[in-house]
UniProtKB/Swiss-Prot annotation:
<dbReference type="GO" id="GO:0004458">
    <property type="term" value="F:D-lactate dehydrogenase (cytochrome) activity"/>
</dbReference>
<keyword id="KW-0004">4Fe-4S</keyword>
<dbReference type="InterPro" id="IPR017900">
    <property type="entry name" value="4Fe4S_Fe_S_CS"/>
</dbReference>
<feature type="binding site">
    <location>
        <position position="677"/>
    </location>
    <ligand>
        <name>[4Fe-4S] cluster</name>
    </ligand>
</feature>
<dbReference type="InterPro" id="IPR016166">
    <property type="entry name" value="FAD-bd_PCMH"/>
</dbReference>
<feature type="binding site">
    <location>
        <position position="503"/>
    </location>
    <ligand>
        <name>(R)-2-hydroxyglutarate</name>
    </ligand>
</feature>
<keyword id="KW-0274">FAD</keyword>
<dbReference type="InterPro" id="IPR006094">
    <property type="entry name" value="Oxid_FAD_bind_N"/>
</dbReference>
<dbReference type="GO" id="GO:1903457">
    <property type="term" value="P:lactate catabolic process"/>
</dbReference>
<dbReference type="Pfam" id="PF01565">
    <property type="entry name" value="FAD_binding_4"/>
</dbReference>
<dbReference type="GO" id="GO:0050660">
    <property type="term" value="F:flavin adenine dinucleotide binding"/>
</dbReference>
<dbReference type="Pfam" id="PF02913">
    <property type="entry name" value="FAD-oxidase_C"/>
</dbReference>
<dbReference type="InterPro" id="IPR017896">
    <property type="entry name" value="4Fe4S_Fe-S-bd"/>
</dbReference>
<dbReference type="InterPro" id="IPR016169">
    <property type="entry name" value="FAD-bd_PCMH_sub2"/>
</dbReference>
<feature type="binding site">
    <location>
        <position position="674"/>
    </location>
    <ligand>
        <name>[4Fe-4S] cluster</name>
    </ligand>
</feature>
<comment type="function">
    <text>Catalyzes the oxidation of D-2-hydroxyglutarate (D-2-HGA) to 2-oxoglutarate. Provides the way to recycle D-2-HGA produced during L-serine synthesis by SerA, by converting it back to 2-oxoglutarate. The physiological molecule that functions as the primary electron acceptor during D-2-HGA oxidation is unknown.</text>
</comment>
<dbReference type="GO" id="GO:0051539">
    <property type="term" value="F:4 iron, 4 sulfur cluster binding"/>
</dbReference>
């Protein structure tokens, strides 16, 4: 039995007092002090980890004013704050050990848009892609491009002065910030924008500013004016100019304007809370073309890049073979393999993605033609190691290429082995003309340590992302981490560059003095003193105030690995999904129609995300290791939950009801909101697979605490369903009674229970004169006779609750000339796995696997109708049974149809089968698990419908919110409905439900209960076409 985990770091009393007083000040936002909430924001996208005391989620600028004004009381002077946005920073910018102020949950409003003048005013928590989605109908966009654009907030972009692809033309974020509204540490609101330099320097009273604002404007303007010559002379001359703090660009080129905004952009929250921003917008280019140039080596791609820049391309992105090979193993490659074809004998080892864009089509065509002509000449003469190139000008193809490039960062984290590519020297920047030589020396530095690494980036701007693979759980490699960091810092100085060309400084700030002269470093500290004299805003980053004894963070600041190292290696291996999470945050994707992660999308609570759940489990494992729990105790295959422990479990459960704390309860709360949709198992670049370690957690959690009755009912549904189906009328009568529904809700916590099929599947098969065959008859058939037979593998949901789907699939296959055989129903066990009955699941899976292996030996295809169940044979069965699983293979309905429809005889037969003479427009709503594990399935369904003379439109939808039993649990009703409304309801609205199709039983059930319509399975639509 596992121990009670109650020894956790407590919140300091002075912080609790502050939070109590803040609530009395009518703070409207959220306050979080739970250990789970603190853990979820203890990390960002870096290797670092610091546990905050508390998290504040303000709703308004007024809330931030309340936060800061209260903090100025004498008793709260020791409290420090760190603003936080999307948490995508790679250098620890948004973590600290005091109070985090997270603006991403509530401050997400787009406040004002002026299309004519091309500007927009937003709150700091707006996500970049969210803004561009809003702007797209107006033909406008916010330019700076990031690989994390679907979860990075504009406040975070401003604070790090982010930039990315296309920066030669579009510049950095600061080039597009027209004005800011910020809150100072003293609680005053600071508005900044471009003002007349003369007014600032000589007539400050002419400006409508507060007294403190006047002082900031005038003092900084005077200092930057006095130091202007030194600033221009001593700072690196780069497209990715030095920010944090941007001394150079506070004045425009002719020094007629002064803009304090440029000091705040890139300040990483160390000067003020940036709350709102007025942003410059650009016209969306009407015409875009990519030329994807393939090379035999990365060095060739790198050295060929300046040639592309001279062709006046908008951007040149370079990717090495390490990243490309990881992409080929990911779901993303299915979307780009036709755009990046290769010969196995001549593989792509380097790639340049060259983009031309603008509103003059003829000009772009000329540029593309000219470059292609030069490339053809080089290929003809075997120059520059170019394999070939492919051109794409359609927007969907362009977006797919860039989606692959954006995912490259996360893909590196999925490298095999304990050493993982990590960010710490990944955004160095040197003058583009020095890049090839610089990278050559950089690679030599890494090669001398025998390190693996991936490279990709913006070679046109002299920025290349490099992530060396290190195992920071190994203390020797931590030393190497420091050594490499120091050496690369010196290398960038040697080549006239910067250690931070794109992602800000963060904990790397302690290298800052190396890149500034003593005179200019003093100016930075002076600016910090003006804004934050007591070093209370993101302390340890950028610089410290003058006369401060505080120090900057070290590159060896507390790391995630410091905690992970405490967990035995065997346990890390058993829970490697949780351990491998690198914080990339793709599960925070704002897109409401993306599959990952449904609970995070509607709750806005990062605990309820794959990253949050991974953090919970890692800490759970660490705390148990500290309680001397052995690896054997955390191997469900080696543990038994004995009946003799029932009394103890009952006692523990009573203590839980009485409010006794156990961190395991917080972990369980995070796991209870997981829908087990499996999106994270494929959509996450690291493929962390929360449902897998969630099931293990439930198994162990319930070795200490009793299970709720509903878990036992769910786990035994497959056993009971066949018996209940024989008396469907009887059970349905009682299920429909209001008193029964109320009783079930109150006592079992279940609601909206589905009705058994009437008539039953067996009765419906009798009606269509279906006849099966015995095993003896099947074994006596010849190979030719077996060719027309298929085995239908039943699942409990369609067979007993949606039997018409099975009947119609039988009829469809018969009409196509096949002889379907319905195999005897046997439990699959998926529900047991979801609820953590792992011992029972393994036994059930073994029985089903033995049966299906026996059937597979007959050489007859096995076909299932519900994709979630079919895919469990490939996933959960493989994990649980390993080599004992056998080699049986169950096809989904569309896989079987696709295979059969490739037969010329069947194609000819299909032409002669009587079917509707109309081409109907159907809409497919794919099951989320099917979409993630089988990314080509929607396209394959389209091909199948095309064979039937029909048009199938695929709707991009997220999770429906049902997910098996999740949507039937009373505690999940609010979340289930919100998940449904955010995607499915919107996509179904306005469409004729008769032509809307859903492959998943759960999805059809969810639509039925909220829309009161019944969607068809695609096989039913095909049958209708044949009728």
């Amino acid at each position: 039995m596992l121990p009670n985990l109650n020894r956790i770091p407590q919140v300091e009393q002075y912080v609790l007092d502050y939070l109590d007083d803040l609530q009395c000040q009518h703070f409207e936002g959220d306050i979080a002090t739970n250990y789970a909430d603190r853990l979820s924001l203890a990390t960002d996208n870096s290797v670092y980890q610091q546990l905050p005391q508390a998290i504040l989620f303000p709703k308004t600028v007024a809330d931030i004013v309340r936060i800061t004004k209260l903090a100025n009381l004498p008793e709260y002077q020791s409290i420090s704050f760190t603003p936080r946005g999307g948490g995508t920073g790679t250098n620890g910018q948004s973590i600290n050990n005091n109070i985090i102020v997270d603006l991403s949950r509530h401050m997400t409003a787009i406040l004002e848009l002026n299309v004519k003048e091309r500007w927009v005013r937003v709150q700091a928590g707006v996500v970049k892609d969210q803004l561009n989605q809003f702007l797209k109908p107006h033909g406008l966009f916010f330019a700076p491009e990031l690989s994390t654009s679907n979860r990075a907030t504009l406040g975070g972009m401003i604070n790090t002065d982010a930039s990315g692809q296309g920066s030669l033309q579009y510049g950095k974020t600061s080039n597009h910030v027209l004005a800011l509204r910020a809150v100072l540490i003293n609680g005053e609101i600071l508005d900044t924008s471009a003002v007349n330099s003369v007014d600032v320097l000589e007539n400050i009273d002419a400006l409508e500013l507060s007294e403190s604002s006047k002082k900031l404007h005038q003092t900084i303007a005077q200092h930057c004016k006095e130091k202007r010559a030194a600033i221009i002379k001593d700072l690196p001359q780069l497209n990715r100019f030095l920010t944090g703090y941007d001394l150079k660009n506070v004045f425009n080129e002719d020094e007629s304007e002064f803009n304090l905004t440029r000091i705040l952009t890139g300040s990483e929250g160390s000067l003020a809370f940036i709350c709102e921003a007025k942003l410059n917008l650009l016209l969306i280019p009407q015409y875009r073309t990519l030329i994807n140039i393939k090379y035999r080596s990365f060095d060739a791609a790198l050295r060929n890049a300046p040639f592309m820049v001279k062709a006046n391309a908008l951007s040149v992105e370079t990717v090495d073979s390490k990243v490309l090979n990881l992409a080929k193993q990911d779901i993303i490659w299915h979307s780009v393999n036709e755009l990046l074809t290769e010969d196995e004998k001549d593989p792509i080892l380097g790639l340049n993605i060259v983009e031309f864009a603008g509103n003059n089509k003829e000009k772009i065509d000329r540029q593309v033609t000219a470059l292609c002509r030069l490339l053809d000449e080089k290929i003809e003469h075997n120059q520059d190691h170019i394999i070939g190139y492919q051109v794409c000008s359609d927007l969907p193809s362009i977006e797919r290429i860039y989606a692959m490039r954006k995912k490259a960062v996360g893909l590196l984290g999925n490298a095999k082995g304990a050493a993982k590519p990590i960010p710490f020297v990944e955004d160095t920047c040197v003058p583009p003309e020095n890049l090839a030589d610089y990278i050559s020396e950089f690679r030599a530095l890494l090669d001398q340590h025998n390190l693996q690494y991936g490279m990709f980036g913006h070679v046109d701007a002299g920025v290349l992302h490099v992530r060396p693979a290190l195992d920071l759980c190994d203390k020797e490699q931590v030393k190497l981490f420091k050594q490499i960091s120091d050496e690369v810092a010196e290398l960038t100085i040697k080549y006239g560059g910067l250690l931070w060309g794109e992602h800000g400084k963060g904990v790397r700030s302690h290298y800052g003095e190396k890149f500034f002269t003593p005179e200019l470093w003093h100016e930075l500290r002076y600016i910090k003193t003006l804004f934050d004299p007591n070093n209370r805003l993101n302390p340890g980053k950028i610089c410290t105030p003058l006369d401060s004894k505080d120090e900057l963070y070290s590159i060896l600041s507390p790391m995630r690995a410091d905690k992970d190292r405490q967990i035995p290696i065997q346990i890390r291996d058993e829970f490697k999904g949780a351990m491998n999470c690198n914080g990339n945050g793709l599960c925070f994707n704002f897109d409401e129609h993306s599959i990952m992660c449904p609970s995070m999308k509607v709750s806005k609570n990062r605990v309820f995300s794959p990253k949050g759940r991974a953090a919970m489990v890692r800490e759970w494992l660490r705390l148990m290791a500290n309680e001397n729990v052995s690896p054997e105790q955390l191997d469900f295959r080696k543990t038994e939950i004995k009946l003799t422990a029932l009394v103890k479990r009952l006692s523990n459960t009573v203590q839980k009801w009485r409010g006794n704390y156990d961190f395991s309860h917080e972990v369980k709360a995070a796991m209870d909101t997981c829908l087990a949709c499996k999106a994270c198992a494929s959509q996450c670049p690291i493929k962390i697979d929360v449902p897998s370690f969630r099931a293990k957690f439930f198994h162990f959690y319930h070795s200490r605490y009793l299970r709720p009755t509903k878990d036992h009912i769910v786990a035994n549904l497959e056993i009971a369903a066949p018996y209940m189906a024989k008396q469907a009328k009887f059970f349905n009568y009682f299920t429909k009674l209001k008193v029964t529904q109320t009783l079930v809700e109150k006592t079992l916590g279940m609601t909206d229970l589905p009705l058994l099929s009437e008539p039953s599947l067996q009765q419906q098969l009798v009606e269509i004169h279906y006849q099966g065959k015995s095993l003896e008859e099947l074994e006596s058939l010849s190979a030719v006779e077996k060719n027309d037979i298929l085995f239908i593998v039943q699942d409990p949901y369609t067979s007993y609750y949606d039997a018409k789907v099975i009947r119609d699939f039988v009829m469809l296959t018969q009409k196509l000339g096949f002889k379907p055989i319905l195999l005897p129903f046997k439990p699959n066990g998926k529900a047991m796995h979801i609820k953590g009955f792992l011992k029972r699941f393994s036994k059930t899976a073994q029985n089903q696997a033995e049966f299906l292996n026996r059937m597979a030996k007959l050489g007859i295809p096995l076909v299932g109708v519900d994709p979630a169940i079919v895919l469990s044979y490939r996933d959960e069965y493989k994990e649980a049974l390993q080599e004992k699983r056998g080699d049986f293979h169950v096809l989904t309905a569309h896989e079987w149809l696709k295979q059969r429809l490739q037969n010329a005889d069947l194609q000819e037969k299909l032409k002669n089968i009587a079917k509707t003479d109309r081409t109907l427009g159907w809409y497919l709503f794919p099951h989320c698990t099917e979409s993630t594990f089988m990314p080509n399935s929607p396209k394959e369904w389209q091909e199948i419908f095309g064979r039937f003379g029909q048009q199938l439109n695929v709707e991009k939808v997220g999770c429906c919110g049902m997910a098996g039993v999740f949507g039937h649990e009373v505690q999940n009703q609010k979340m289930s409905r919100e998940i449904y409304d955010v995607s499915w309801h919107k996509k179904l609205h306005g469409k004729d439900p008769h032509f809307c199709l859903a492959t998943g039983y759960s999805c059809r059930s969810q639509v039925k209960r909220y829309e009161h319509v019944v969607l068809k399975h695609p096989v039913q639509a095909l049958l209708e076409v044949l009728k």
